[in-house]
A protein has these predicted regions:
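Nuclease and nuclease-like effector domains acting on nucleic acids or nucleotide cofactors
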Residues: 2-143, 155-173, 198, 219-241, ...
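Domain-level detector of nuclease and nuclease-like folds
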Residues: 137-313
Length: 313
């Protein structure tokens, strides 16, 4: 689908250039990569892009957005907002969304997404079932949490309700306390609420792994990053990047592309290329198709990347 271009943030650019002033050795690399990326003469491999410092990655992407109006149509970032009436019918609150996920989608598939750990009706994880005994002393590792594959902060942080919740009367409690940005957006922004509670974007995860992944982007880390027992998840806090297990990459890719198309969220060209690759390499299996059908029956909208899977260019 066509997508409306989102302009670069002046604040983000100023922060990026201020960072480079403090780290002068990045200037040459940043200038070269950004310039070549702008003209489109060279597309950096996404695995190499993942290894760049986050400030440099963001600066390159923001530079592309700034010159986007000057580029040929085929190179542009374009987004089209989804009308409110076209949004999926998702749960009205977070508690209901989680309960629906566990009781109506995963009721007979009680294993976590990334690490394949078994869990019981009380959402207590059997760490021995997936080789995560090394986390036995971590209380958060013993519970299941609903993980946003497309991080909520990524589609919330540019919204006014997230940035300035104090401006909304509905975001103040009876005692005068101002709600957090996430809580405020859930109250006043229907599109955010729908995306936040969309079951297509929610997966049961070991709580500790969910917390360590935080809101990091997906990508490749080669051998750089923390690992957890027998789980193939790898996370690098300095790069703010997480490399998922091979078995989860196809589902992650199709989820990210679904969220992009359904809610108009922006993905960088590097991210899109990565997700196309993962989608092509890892087609949906029987459970992913069944999961999609169950969610479609609940929300009225399925994930077309699962339902009508095909190789992406």
């Amino acid at each position: 689908m066509s997508r409306r271009r989102v302009p670069a943030s002046k604040t983000d650019l100023l922060r990026f250039f201020h960072t480079l002033r403090q780290r002068p050795r990045l200037w040459l690399l940043g200038a070269v990569v950004a310039c070549v990326s702008v003209v489109g003469a060279f597309q950096m491999p996404h695995w190499a892009m993942d290894l760049l410092p986050p400030e440099l990655r963001q600066g390159i992407q923001q530079t592309r957005l700034m010159v986007d109006p000057l580029l040929p149509d085929a190179w542009r970032y374009r987004y089209e907002p989804v009308p409110a009436e076209a949004l999926p019918t998702t749960a009205s609150n977070w508690t209901l969304a989680r309960r629906t996920l566990y009781e109506r989608v995963y009721h007979d598939q009680m294993h976590t997404f990334y690490c394949g750990c078994q869990y019981d009706e009380n959402l207590r994880v059997d760490l021995g079932s997936c080789g995560l005994d090394v986390l036995a002393d971590r209380s958060r590792a013993l519970r299941v949490e609903a993980e946003h594959v497309f991080p909520a902060s990524h589609f919330g942080q540019f919204r006014r309700c997230w940035q300035e919740p104090d401006r909304y009367e509905a975001c103040r409690t009876a005692g005068g306390r101002t709600l957090s940005g996430r809580e405020c957006c859930q109250r006043v922004d229907p599109a955010f609420l729908a995306a936040h509670n969309d079951l297509h974007n929610l997966f049961p995860s070991v709580g500790y792994i969910n917390g360590r992944r935080s809101n990091y982007n997906w990508g490749y880390l080669l051998w750089f990053g923390d690992t957890y027992g027998d789980c193939e998840m790898r996370i690098n806090r300095w790069l703010r990047r997480a490399e998922p297990p091979v078995a989860a990459r196809g589902s992650i890719a199709r989820t990210m592309l679904y969220m992009r198309d359904t809610y108009g969220f922006r993905l960088s060209r590097w991210d899109e290329r990565r997700y196309y690759t993962w989608n092509n390499q890892h087609p949906p299996d029987a459970w992913e198709r069944e999961r999609n059908q169950r969610i479609q029956a609940i929300q009225g909208v399925g994930n077309a990347y699962v339902e009508h899977w095909r190789q992406l260019p």
